[in-house]
Amino acid sequence: MKNNSIRTVVATGIGAALFIIIGMFVNIPIFGNTSIQLQYAVQALFSVIFGPITGFFMGFIGHALKDGIQYGNISWAWVLASGITGLVIGLFGKKYDVTMGKFSVMSMIWFNLAQALGLLIGYGVVTPIGDKIQFAQAWSYLYAQSFVAGVANFITIAIGGTLLLAIYASSRTQSGSLTKD
């Protein structure tokens, strides 16, 4: 258990650092303060490989630090939504266990259903309500911004996350594939 805890902490730290760096330097603005951000594909990879705790804290810590550094202001609802997305993807990790060298079509479907659920909770519920509480913005703007971000993140994870997981799975040795000479 102790070894697993160390692994989780190290993966979380590395993941949060990647979240910050990718989020600050690789983003494409699309609406308001919303942009296509590729760090969510990397977060999905870490969530699957290292589990839901790493996925949550990678998104939560990484997003909080990124916003604090980049904007000088932290939108806690969006930070929580990033964490929730990683948590949900990681919770369903057994459905698409890529560590065994396989990432089947059914695994891809489960992965994308899990990320859709995480994004729906995070960006369909948490961000609009949290921003209403924190910033008192108009509901129409909050839901529009959350919808655009959720869809952008879904597409990013569906393409980038699926590709990263497929590449990772192909780099693993499949169970039972080695034979004794």
Curated annotation (Swiss-Prot):
> Where primarily located?
membrane
Q: Which Pfam families match?
A: ECF-ribofla_trS
Check the record and name the InterPro entries matching this protein: ECF_substrate-spec-like, UPF0397
What's a GO cellular component annotated to this UniProt protein? Answer: plasma membrane
- Per the UniProt record, which residue ranges are transmembrane? 11-31, 45-65, 72-92, 109-129, 147-167
Its record classes its membrane topology as: Multi-pass membrane protein
Record key words, sorted? Cell membrane, Membrane, Transmembrane, Transmembrane helix
Q: Where in the cell is it found?
A: Cell membrane
Q: Which domain of life is it from?
A: Bacteria
Q: What family is this?
A: Belongs to the UPF0397 family.
Q: What is this protein called?
A: UPF0397 protein STER_0346
Which organism does this record belong to? Streptococcus thermophilus (strain ATCC BAA-491 / LMD-9)
Q: What is the lineage of its organism?
A: Bacteria, Bacillati, Bacillota, Bacilli, Lactobacillales
